[in-house]
């Protein structure tokens, strides 16, 4: 069963990948999946040109189960995508990518994210080390207040707050 598709245009959560000529290298598909997972998730349509025209997928990419397994094997931690054949007359693979609750990379260590260019079209760009902390914080996985403060000494802490914390800890210990 295949559903007819209106592909529209690329967005932050929708990426088109051509599979014509020599076919799309697996590494490029994996990078597109990583970028989507590190943003808000979305869909990669394999066999669709940048303008939204369906041109089809090559035989080596027509196995949704194999494609999903290849993506899981080439992402760290493994991304569990759902791939399915779609398209009316022209076979296209729709790869549904979940939003990751951590930062994911390709097996070769590339960390990417999606962003809008000045002209309003989306692109996949590197995620730099300082952006990783922000991403983890946005996901509620990083507590900035738990980060070490270089050069801090005991004198930097309010003595009244230190006493209050001692009382809280002793109350907690005695209630166990």
Located regions from the model:
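Conserved N-terminal catalytic/coupling substructures associated with nucleotide/phosphate chemistry
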Residues: 1-176
């Amino acid at each position: 069963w295949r559903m007819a598709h209106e592909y529209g245009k690329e967005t932050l959560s929708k990426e088109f990948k051509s599979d014509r000529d020599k076919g799309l290298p697996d590494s490029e598909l994996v990078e597109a999946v990583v970028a989507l997972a590190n943003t808000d998730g979305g869909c990669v349509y394999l066999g669709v040109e940048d303008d939204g025209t369906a041109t089809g997928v090559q035989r080596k990419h027509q196995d949704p189960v194999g494609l999903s397994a290849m993506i899981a094997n080439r992402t760290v931690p493994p991304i569990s995508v759902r791939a399915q054949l779609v398209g009316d007359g022209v076979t296209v693979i729709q790869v549904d990518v979940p939003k990751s609750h951590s930062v994911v990379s390709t097996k070769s260590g590339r960390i990417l994210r999606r962003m809008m260019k000045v002209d309003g079209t989306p692109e996949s760009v590197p995620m730099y080390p300082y952006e990783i902390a922000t991403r983890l914080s946005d996901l509620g996985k990083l507590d900035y207040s738990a980060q070490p403060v270089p050069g801090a000494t005991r004198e930097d802490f309010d003595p009244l707050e230190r006493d209050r914390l001692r009382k809280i800890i002793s109350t907690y210990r005695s209630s166990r």
